[in-house]
């Protein structure tokens, strides 16, 4: 039974109903419909913290999905799962792959910056200020890209960039 039929959460049910209606009325191929079904089921599993199941659905959606834009969101969500699992190198890889297909994903740039900032903090704890600065500089570059795409967002990142003198805002 598809995951969307066994979920008891009201929001998830609403999403599933709307998604099912869209699948019926929007002209798409059967492959596109199957890809979206796997993507939808992956999102539902991910929202419940069932990451292994979510990844299985996302990988199947990737196998079926041909549109680069749609693939970017699948890759982004795979990156989110790896971030949640503390697998930062894998997460960065998936965020990069998502951005190759869709360079207008500020949330991917932000998440990459957060990972780099975290690695900088870890380098400080290990007493390696030179490595820390390199990670912080990389975080700054990613945050600048996220902010350029959505200037009103990422206020904390903007403040950090100002405080650390890595970027001046008008």
Curated annotation (Swiss-Prot):
GO terms for biological process: photosynthesis. GO terms for cellular component: chloroplast thylakoid membrane; plastid. It comes from the Eukaryota. It is found in: Plastid, Chloroplast thylakoid membrane. The keyword Repeat applies. Keywords: Chloroplast, Membrane, Photosynthesis, Plastid, Repeat, Thylakoid, TPR repeat. InterPro entries: PSI_Ycf3_assembly, TPR-like_helical_dom_sf, TPR_rpt, Ycf3/AcsC/BcsC/TPR_MFPF. The keyword Nucleotidyltransferase does not apply. Pfam families: TPR_1. It is a peripheral membrane protein. SUPFAM superfamilies: TPR-like (SSF48452). Its main location: plastid. Transmembrane segments: none annotated. TPR repeats lie at residues 35-68, 72-105, 120-153. Essential for the assembly of the photosystem I (PSI) complex. May act as a chaperone-like factor to guide the assembly of the PSI subunits. Belongs to the Ycf3 family. This is Photosystem I assembly protein Ycf3. It comes from Oryza sativa subsp. indica. The lineage of its organism: Eukaryota, Viridiplantae, Streptophyta, Embryophyta, Tracheophyta. The gene is ycf3.
